[in-house]
Curated annotation (Swiss-Prot):
L-glutamine binds at residues 366, 394-397, 416, 477. This is CTP synthase. It comes from Mycobacterium tuberculosis (strain ATCC 25618 / H37Rv). Mg(2+) binds at residues 78, 152. The lineage of its organism: Bacteria, Bacillati, Actinomycetota, Actinomycetes, Mycobacteriales. Residues 1-278 are annotated as: Amidoligase domain.
Length: 586
């Protein structure tokens, strides 16, 4: 007789076919938001079919950003979508990789836990995947068991890498019973311009591949650049053996935050609720409708330059971009993000060309020396012009380096970029020295996860947060060198937030009488921003950018800036010059 240890929780699997990047993560997130708005407790999980244990050491150009959870896991960027749409924190177990699964199974084999069995993909690998899927149905820290677990299966049906995950999902349905498991398949319906036709054959083949491994989808998401006509939906329902109510047309939406409305219009949430026999209420659109009004009916527009080294792939800064937009929503403003390659800002003329028409500058996190002098140059330009600046993680470190150079430490640098610098104003954290030296594992060893900080009561950041006790997520190996605090303070830079013991600098800023808004944080506040609850630092930053834009036409004396060079010196005489007093805007 089949056992049902978790009959209270339903499982919904989301797979993809035909092509990658169809929006499985956004589809899953939007459905999760809809079910949450119906009063259900939803949690989510991403299964990634790569052999890396986590994405922490992967190239951002290949993978996009690394999303850090509260408990310190380095996860896929889709977990960020889940948190933003569900408006709740997820644990590190929300991301499962092939690397994690194989590492666990091999470790068990070495300990002799398989009692001499021949260890194979089936059943040992699939059993470990099933264990991790079913574990998501356990009660959370508050003792609440989820009503629904939505699990996104990465990759595309037909990929070799995804097969163990799909097989495990099939076995979960067999184990829990068909009435407790739902399969949602996302497929492409391409439009052929020469013939003016939408083609259903790729979707039919994708579903056939899924059925060949024992999975018949309960519903299909048809991705297209236009609505799929009813006649084609009926054809797909017939050929793929799916209820017509489960064939969902999802044309491209103006904003990702419109997707829940698109799915609701097609009645996907109602179909899922009926199919899984879930308790529910009508969708409460109060909060989401307010968000959509702010998205589509802005009162003004501001331009923010994101000065980074991975700007060719916007996914490398996905959470930063979404946090900026959310900060704009709070002000009923549209934030236009100007993607600026940091290499181009190394000189004053380069910075002026790149930043001359923006209303704020954001310096995001990153690793490695490439582009660092450009980030520092962008800060120098913005500080002299009175442009609002927000620095995140590495951004804080660049603000500190720029401040140090402005008070005579012309060779100030980070130990990360120049281990032999005479003035390492940014130093390796003591517990990271062995790792940086190459004597320990690189992956998963940074200062990761949520840490508390104490803010100075009268600081800009305390005013933004409306409290002096905060907690933010981190991902770094380097910190401000406390031996240089007094010297750096001569620039006017204030260390406005530290760890509770006062040792680690968490926030820096210039007082409002020195600059309208320059704030840096060692943390990654973008990871806690939500579209309906924007992060206070981003709200304050966008507000400062709006004020700057409003003051652009006022008569302001612009000081002349000495030409900036990568080592912080002047082209004229090779001697470092302190920056002129920054322009102040009322």
């Amino acid at each position: 007789m089949r056992k049902h240890p978790q009959t209270a929780t339903k499982h919904l699997f989301v797979s993809g076919g035909v092509a990658s990047s169809l929006g499985k993560g956004l589809t899953a997130s939007s459905l999760g938001q809809l079910l949450t708005a119906r009063g259900l407790h939803v949690t989510m999980q991403k299964l990634d079919p790569y052999l890396n244990v986590d994405p922490g050491t992967m190239n951002p150009f290949q993978h996009g950003e690394v999303f850090v959870t509260e408990d310190g896991a380095e996860t896929d960027l889709d977990v960020g979508h889940y948190e933003r749409f569900l408006d709740r924190n997820l644990p590190g177990s929300a991301n499962v990789t092939t690397g994690q699964v194989y590492s666990t199974v091999i470790a068990k084999e070495r300990r002799g836990e398989y009692l001499g069995d021949t260890v194979q993909v089936i059943p040992h690998i699939t059993d470990e995947i099933k264990r991790r899927i079913l574990a998501m149905a356990q009660p959370d820290a508050d003792g609440n068991r989820p009503d629904v677990v939505i699990t996104e299966i990465g990759g595309t049906v037909g990929d070799i890498e995804s097969q163990p995950f799909l097989e495990a999902a099939r076995q979960v349905r067999h184990y829990l019973g068909r009435e407790d498991v739902f399969f949602l398949h996302v497929s492409l319906v391409p439009y052929l311009a020469p013939s003016g036709e939408l083609k259903t054959k790729p979707t039919q083949h994708s579903v056939a591949a899924l059925r060949s491994i024992g999975i018949t989808p309960d519903a299909l998401i048809l991705r297209c650049d236009r609505d799929v006509p009813e006649a084609l939906k009926n054809k797909i329902a017939l050929m793929c053996d799916v209820d017509i109510d489960g064939v969902i047309s999802t044309p491209d939406a103006p904003s990702i935050y419109d997707i829940p409305k698109v799915l609701h219009r097609e009645e996907l949430d109602a179909f899922v609720v009926r199919r899984l026999n879930l308790p529910f209420r009508d969708v409460d659109w109060t909060e989401w409708d307010d968000l959509l009004r702010r998205v589509h009916e802005p009162h003004e527009t501001v331009r923010i330059a994101l000065v980074g080294k991975y700007v060719e792939l916007s996914d490398a800064y996905l959470s930063v971009a979404e946090a900026l937009r959310a900060g704009g929503f709070k002000h009923r403003a549209k934030v236009e993000i100007c993607w600026v390659a940091s290499d181009g800002c190394e000189t004053t003329s380069g910075a002026a060309a790149a930043l001359g028409d923006v209303h704020g500058v954001l310096i995001p996190g990153g690793f490695g020396i490439r582009g660092i002098e450009g980030k520092i140059g962008a800060i120098a330009y913005a500080r002299a012009r009175g442009l609002p600046v927000l620095g995140l993680c590495l951004g804080l470190q660049c603000i500190v380096i720029e401040a140090a150079r402005s008070v005579g430490l012309t060779n100030a640098n980070s130990a990360e970029f120049d281990p032999d610098t005479p003035d390492p104003v940014i130093a390796t954290m003591p517990d990271q020295e062995e790792i940086v030296a190459g004597e320990a594992d690189l992956g998963g060893t940074m200062r990761l996860g949520s840490y508390p900080a104490v803010l100075e009561p009268d600081s800009v950041v305390a005013q933004a947060y409306q409290t002096t006790q905060v907690s933010e997520r981190h991902r770094h190996r380097y910190e401000v060198n406390n031996a240089y605090r007094d010297k750096i303070a001569e620039s006017g830079l204030r260390f406005s937030g530290t760890s509770p013991d006062g040792h680690l600098v968490e926030f820096v800023e210039y007082p409002p009488d020195r600059h309208p808004f320059v704030v840096g944080t060692q943390a990654h506040p973008e990871l806690k921003s939500r579209p309906t609850r924007p992060h206070p630092l981003f709200v304050a930053f966008v507000g400062a950018a709006i004020d700057y834009k409003a003051g652009e036409l006022l008569p302001v004396e612009i000081p002349e800036i000495p030409e900036h060079t990568p080592n912080g010196s002047s082209h004229r005489d090779g001697v470092g010059q302190p920056l002129p007093e920054p322009a102040s805007r009322g």
